[in-house]
């Protein structure tokens, strides 16, 4: 299966460091110790580009540190579902994060 470059962009004011951890090896294989740090590109936007298998559904969470203690939360502190993406050429996945657990 061919690979394609996917950009994950996170918009948040809730953290100075942002990581993604997900279902593929390129996103840490659900091990937060291997979570991928995003680069801060503006005051509230973080971004990373990764090669992923085209057409394979990928799940991920956003973290404010390399621990599940730092996982993203909803606006009221509630748990949220995993983000899903299906890599395709030129895909830019934009996620807004209101809060983190810590």
Regions picked out by a protein language model, each given a short descriptive name:
Residues 56-60:
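Exposed beta-strand face motif in extracellular beta-rich ectodomains
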Residues 90-102:
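Compositionally biased low-complexity segments at domain edges in trafficked proteins
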């Amino acid at each position: 299966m061919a690979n394609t470059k996917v950009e994950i962009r996170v918009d948040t004011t809730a953290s100075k460091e942002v990581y993604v951890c997900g279902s593929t090896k390129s996103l840490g294989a659900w091990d937060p110790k291997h979570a991928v740090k995003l680069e801060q590109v503006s005051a509230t936007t973080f971004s990373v580009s990764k090669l992923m298998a085209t057409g394979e559904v990928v799940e991920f969470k956003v973290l404010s540190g390399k621990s599940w203690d730092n996982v993203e939360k909803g606006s009221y502190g509630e748990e949220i579902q995993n983000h899903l993406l299906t890599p395709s050429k030129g895909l830019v996945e934009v996620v807004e994060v209101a809060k983190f657990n810590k």
